[in-house]
């Protein structure tokens, strides 16, 4: 086992795993499991990339407070990076995102400022901008910062190219949050693997890319207002209520071969099936990407190779509908197993 100088050196180099039970016959279906990053999501890459770029440029000063708007995963990644490097961190987050996320960030030393659920991502971004300007804090601007896709071009994309060197890679399937993974990896695949088709998934409730309606922007690239095609959806971390500038770059580059819309119920079904049939424990957005990959498989020629990105672990979804039907108490079947032998039974609960 390798030795590392600090936790940040362990970011990246996540495994590509073949799907054995859920893959359609005749298709080689793989997933890249970003939960293997130290804080459990693909956003660990972004967090390190934007902080190191700001240090190099001089934008971020020693001891300066860092601030970002986040649905959770970027904030968790930033909390790890800031703890390791010695920067205070404040995150703004809509109150609708899972409680686990805010607790994880606070456990890592960050301060979490909640914004009204009705104001969605637009509200938490506006609050972060306001706080940064008022207090002189460094705003990482994950939705516009070029260090985000650059990090994915240097790491995620290189890993994919290396893992499939000399082999077929017919389809690469991803979702989008900031668009960093989509745009960064697409830049490299278009140059080095032009044969690979790039497929992007988005929520059926928020078909912003599918609508072909342009996002209204301020001069600095930030959204001027929410996108008209957005409606709330259960895929936390996917598709904020605007099209990020970084995502729009991939659209403008015309690197996307296909856009799929995914229903929330299908995303959660795939998350559960990955856990129970493949032993792969991921969140709702990963289930959404996997649902998209299965859709691609339906029309892919025999022998095709499909790779889907799985952005995060499932543990930060315990309080969400993904776990809504998972009981804390023993089920009837579990009680029957318990009662099949005479000892060490729990006492019946009072009525």
Functional labels for PLM-detected ranges:
Residues 294-311, 318-330:
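Catalytic phosphate/nucleotide-handling subdomain of diverse soluble enzymes
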């Amino acid at each position: 086992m390798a030795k590392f100088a600090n936790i940040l050196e362990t970011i990246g180099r996540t495994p590509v795993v073949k799907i054995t039970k859920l893959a359609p016959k005749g298709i080689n279906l793989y997933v890249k499991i970003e939960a293997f990053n130290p804080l459990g999501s693909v956003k660990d890459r972004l967090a390190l990339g934007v902080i190191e770029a700001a240090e190099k440029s001089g934008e971020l000063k020693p001891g300066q407070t860092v601030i970002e708007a986040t649905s959770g995963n970027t904030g968790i990644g930033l909390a790890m990076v800031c703890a390791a490097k010695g920067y205070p961190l404040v995150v703004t987050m809509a109150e609708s995102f899972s409680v686990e996320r805010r607790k994880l960030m606070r456990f890592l030393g960050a301060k979490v400022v909640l914004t009204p659920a009705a104001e969605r991502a637009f509200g938490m971004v506006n609050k972060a901008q306001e706080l940064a300007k008022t207090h002189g804090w460094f705003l990482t601007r994950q939705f516009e910062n070029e260090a985000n896709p650059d990090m994915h071009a240097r790491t995620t994309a290189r890993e994919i190219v290396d893992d499939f060197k000399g082999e077929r890679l017919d389809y690469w399937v991803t979702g989008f949050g900031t668009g960093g993974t989509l745009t960064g990896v697409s830049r490299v695949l278009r140059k080095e693997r032009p044969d690979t088709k790039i497929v992007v998934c988005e929520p059926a409730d928020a078909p912003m890319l599918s609508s072909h309606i342009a996002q209204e922007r301020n001069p600095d690239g930030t959204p001027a207002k929410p996108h008209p095609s957005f409606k709330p959806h259960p895929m936390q971390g996917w598709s904020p209520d605007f099209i990020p500038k970084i995502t729009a770059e991939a659209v403008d580059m015309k690197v996307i071969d296909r856009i799929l819309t995914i229903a929330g119920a299908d995303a959660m079904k795939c998350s559960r099936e990955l856990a129970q049939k493949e032993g792969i424990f991921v969140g709702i957005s990963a289930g959404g990407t996997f649902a998209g990959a299965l859709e691609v498989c339906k029309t892919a020629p025999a022998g095709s190779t499909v790779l889907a990105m799985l952005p995060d672990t499932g543990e930060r979804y315990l309080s969400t509908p993904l776990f809504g039907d998972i009981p804390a108490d023993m089920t009837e079947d579990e009680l029957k197993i318990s009662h099949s032998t005479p000892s060490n039974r729990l006492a019946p609960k009072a009525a």
